[in-house]
């Protein structure tokens, strides 16, 4: 349910005079002056409208997910309108789209707002994110299937990005929009036929009152407690699994913590480069751009955050290892604002520097620089000339010894978070797919076929209306991970989906031997003969 309702004088504008003055006076007179009059829905202290297209997840965690005409000084702030393109499931798509227009995308898609008619939903970027992330679709069914993963990831990140900054400079977020009143391919959580899209499930997970989450920007894990109750003795756990379902124990983290009411509480960082000597140390810089993070953002083992300098040639950043260590490889992961030329220097006291490397024609991107092993405490990147007008910007500044260990993680791997109370009861869980190459999840297509066992029963529920509930247990009985399992209740009589229906979960992932209890509740009149079937389809079907 919404936690707040906002009534404004005008949408994305101010009421024409004299209406604005009359509204303000009426509120003062008839509401006793106890309400604040917000004349404009996206200005006057708010952070704007939009964007309305799906971005890669780290965008929502990084300074700043800009809105139109808002107050940028307020950062994340209170965003009254933001959303993404949301393609529905194939079952809904085929109900409104003529078959001759199914594939490939054509002008008929534009009539359903996937084109110039809703250009600000960024349909081309949405298409590109599907292809980059999950591979070129083989047809419309494959397109809609992969689209749900984009819907989940972008919409969950949108809310979690705000929660990550809760009460720092983030105070609220409202989705444009809950549901489209027309069969549409954008801006909806449940579609025209009341089917629950991936966007719904991403947002539902993020909006748990007590919630554990991972940041795409800096790999931090936090507990978000939006209740008014202090929680004591919680246990937060993070586990990482390869595509084959094997737990990678070296990345496991756990901590016992208290979560104060109405606050985010830090748990730990996940370090995916465990032999990076710079991780967790200190970094210092000549300047910091207002649009990026502090120097430490370049040594947080995440390419979702970055340090950036002011736009001057003679800028620098250095890492303090705390004590001398042997360095043999230096990795610089440049953002688009990279150096044209720079030097690498070392020091034992941060005052007297010795040059060990220079690059007069830097192309940006990821540079892995092998040097003759040297023992030092401080390592500096000294800019000589900027390649752009934006100064220098680094996602990561990594330092390694003689033998940089090859990653033991599969190209795509899974992060599983759990939060338990002091008695061991599960309060929150969360699940992410992560890639060694940001945004590239095509390795998911190599998953072996999953094998599931499904049992279910139908029960009547009359405690709050005449309802029926399908209670199902879905178990992974095969050796493979069952990824993004989609469950749909269907009437046996006509093959139509039972909609509208409320469910506790969907698009969930089961490791070997795991099971999930699913409840699907709907009005009894939608299934008068009690005959149904369950469609249970994993991504790796």
Where are these regions (language model features)?
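Intrinsically disordered, low-complexity Pro/Gly/Ser/Thr-rich segments with frequent PxxP/GP/PP motifs
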Residues: 236-238, 242-274, 404-409, 497-525
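Disordered, acidic Ser/Thr/Pro-rich linker "stalks" and the adjacent N-terminal cap
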Residues: 274-324, 333-342, 348, 358-365, ...
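Terminal connector regions
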Residues: 271-275, 406-445, 499, 521-541
């Amino acid at each position: 349910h919404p936690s707040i309702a906002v009534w404004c004088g005008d949408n994305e504008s101010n009421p024409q005079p004299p209406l604005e003055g009359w509204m303000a006076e009426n509120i003062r007179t008839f509401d006793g002056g106890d309400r604040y009059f917000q004349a404009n829905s996206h200005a006057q202290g708010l952070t704007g409208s939009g964007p309305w297209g799906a971005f890669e997840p780290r965008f929502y965690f990084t300074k700043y997910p800009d809105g139109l005409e808002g107050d940028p000084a307020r950062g994340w702030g209170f965003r009254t309108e933001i959303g993404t393109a949301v393609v529905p499931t194939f079952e809904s798509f085929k109900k409104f789209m003529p078959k001759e227009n199914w594939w490939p995308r054509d002008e008929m898609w534009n009539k359903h707002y996937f084109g110039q008619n809703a250009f600000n939903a960024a349909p081309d970027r949405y298409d590109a994110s599907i292809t980059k992330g999950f591979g070129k679709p083989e047809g419309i069914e494959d397109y809609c299937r992969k689209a749900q993963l984009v819907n989940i990831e972008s919409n969950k990140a949108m809310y979690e990005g705000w929660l990550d900054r809760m009460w720092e400079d983030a105070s609220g977020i409202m989705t444009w929009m809950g549901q489209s009143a027309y069969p549409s391919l954008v801006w909806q959580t449940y579609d025209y036929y009341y089917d629950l899209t991936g966007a719904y499930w991403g947002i539902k997970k993020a909006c748990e009152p007590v919630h554990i989450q991972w940041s795409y920007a800096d790999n931090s894990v936090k507990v978000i407690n939006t209740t008014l109750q202090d929680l004591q003795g919680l246990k937060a756990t993070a586990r990482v699994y390869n595509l084959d379902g094997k737990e990678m124990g070296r990345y496991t983290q756990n901590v016992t913590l208290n979560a104060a009411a109405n606050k985010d509480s830090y748990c730990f960082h996940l370090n995916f480069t465990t032999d990076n000597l710079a991780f967790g140390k200190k970094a210092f810089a000549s300047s910091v751009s207002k649009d990026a993070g502090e120097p430490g953002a370049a040594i947080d083992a995440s390419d979702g955050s970055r340090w950036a300098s002011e736009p001057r040639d003679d800028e620098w950043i250095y890492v303090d290892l705390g004590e001398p260590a042997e360095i043999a490889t230096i990795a610089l992961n440049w953002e688009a604002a990279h150096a044209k030329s720079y030097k690498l220097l070392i020091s034992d006291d941060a005052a007297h520097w010795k040059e060990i490397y220079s690059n007069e024609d830097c192309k940006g991107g990821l540079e892995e620089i092998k040097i003759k092993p040297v023992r030092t405490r401080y390592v500096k990147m000294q800019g000589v000339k900027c390649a752009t007008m934006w100064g220098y910007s680094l996602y990561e500044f990594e330092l390694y010894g003689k033998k940089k260990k090859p990653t033991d993680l599969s190209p795509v791997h899974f992060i599983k978070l759990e939060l338990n109370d002091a008695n061991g009861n599960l309060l929150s869980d969360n699940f992410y797919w992560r890639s060694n190459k940001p945004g590239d999840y095509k390795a998911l297509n190599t998953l072996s076929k999953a094998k599931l066992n499904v049992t279910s029963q139908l029960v009547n529920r009359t405690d709050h209306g005449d309802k029926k509930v399908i209670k199902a247990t879905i178990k992974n009985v095969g050796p493979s991970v069952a990824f993004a399992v989609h469950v749909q209740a269907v009437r046996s009589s006509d093959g139509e989906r039972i909609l509208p229906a409320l469910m506790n979960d969907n698009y969930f992932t089961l490791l070997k031997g795991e099971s999930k209890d699913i409840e699907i509740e709907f009005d009894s009149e939608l299934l008068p003969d009690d005959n149904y079937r369950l469609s249970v389809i994993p991504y790796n079907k």
